[in-house]
Each structure stands twice: as structure tokens, then as C-alpha cells.
């Protein structure tokens, strides 16, 4: 909801799965956006609120399709920590970003760690020109002291967080 509201309605093309479960994969998105071209493709993976998850091979397929079609690919991984095998489901990897220069990966730390007031997140891309443009747009002090403190104490709780994510995944599977 936040992303489309940043653009005029006529610039937003929304993909809605045509099934009762609201499930979709890379092929469904490629088919839809081949008929409804866009400059930027946004995938929230896993999706919120449906929980739909496009596996890594599907995300690779979308990323390559975007490269082949000179299309920006925004991948929001804010909830990837709650996916089965989450450690292997992220594109926050320099080699992957270099492979797909049209890709940008975002992750809200605030959401997954349950600290939404901090407004803390990650944005990664191999597109250094894009990063430079973005840096010019953010305020000089773009992280507050609470968020900075959180990042300082995070390593102390990293293992607890990993265990909690695995317990959450197991509870959902049961």
C-alpha cells in the first residue's frame, strides 16, 4: 500500500492473482507484465498480507527477465526471515546484486524485529549511480539515536531472533 501511493494512479499497474488462494509465481508475473509493461517491477517476498512466497529460482527468473527487458526490479524482503529456509532466501548478497544490476533489494528491519517506530531498513543495489542519487535525497542525519542504539545491541540478540523465526515458521507449518 505504501509503494503505489507514491505514484499517480495512472502510473501504477497492479497484479492481482486470479485464484482464491491469491498464490502466484514468477511465470504468472512475467505473463501479466509482458501484457502490461512497467518501468519498475516490485515484488514483496513473502507478500504481506497473503504470505505468498516466490522461491529463489522464481526470483532469479524475474530478475533475469527484468534485466532482459531493461526494467528496474525492486525486491522487498522485509518478511523473508519468516520463510522456510530463510537464510537461503535472500538476495542481500553482493554477487547476486552484481549479477542483476537492475535489481534493488529492500528490507525493513523495523517490521521483522518488531520495532516499527525506529523506521530502520536496508537498501542495496549494484547500481552505484542510483545509490548516489538516493544519498543526495536523504537527510544528513537519516538514522535516529534509538535506531542507532538498536543496531549496537542487535548482535547480542541475533541468535534469539533466529530461534524465534524458526519457532514462528514451525508454528505456522503445524
Language-model features: locations:
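Short, contiguous strand/loop micro-motifs
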Residues: 16, 49-50, 162-163
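Amphipathic alpha-helical repeat scaffolds
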Residues: 45-51, 144
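Active-site pre-lysine segment of PLP-dependent enzymes
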Residues: 23-35, 49-112
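PLP-dependent aminotransferase-like
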Residues: 1-43
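PLP-dependent aminotransferase class I/II
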Residues: 2, 102-174
Amino acid at each position: 500500500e505504501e509503494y503505489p501511493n507514491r505514484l499517480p494512479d495512472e502510473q501504477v499497474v497492479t497484479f492481482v492473482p486470479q485464484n482464491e488462494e491469491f498464490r502466484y509465481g514468477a511465470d504468472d508475473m512475467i505473463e501479466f507484465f509482458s501484457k502490461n509493461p512497467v518501468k519498475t517491477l516490485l515484488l514483496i517476498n513473502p507478500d504481506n498480507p497473503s504470505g505468498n512466497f516466490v522461491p529463489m529460482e522464481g526470483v532469479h527468473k524475474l530478475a533475469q527477465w527484468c534485466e532482459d527487458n531493461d526494467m528496474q526490479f525492486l525486491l522487498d524482503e522485509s518478511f523473508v526471515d519468516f520463510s522456510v529456509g530463510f537464510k537461503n532466501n535472500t538476495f542481500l548478497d553482493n554477487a547476486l546484486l552484481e549479477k542483476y544490476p537492475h535489481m534493488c533489494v529492500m528490507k525493513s528491519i523495523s517490521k521483522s524485529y518488531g520495532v516499527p517506530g525506529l523506521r530502520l531498513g536496508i537498501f542495496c543495489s549494484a547500481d552505484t549511480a542510483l545509490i548516489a542519487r538516493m544519498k543526495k535525497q536523504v537527510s544528513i542525519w537519516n538514522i535516529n539515536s534509538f535506531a542507532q542504539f538498536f543496531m549496537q545491541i542487535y548482535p547480542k540478540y541475533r541468535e534469539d531472533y533466529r530461534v524465534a523465526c524458526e519457532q514462528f515458521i514451525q508454528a505456522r507449518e503445524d
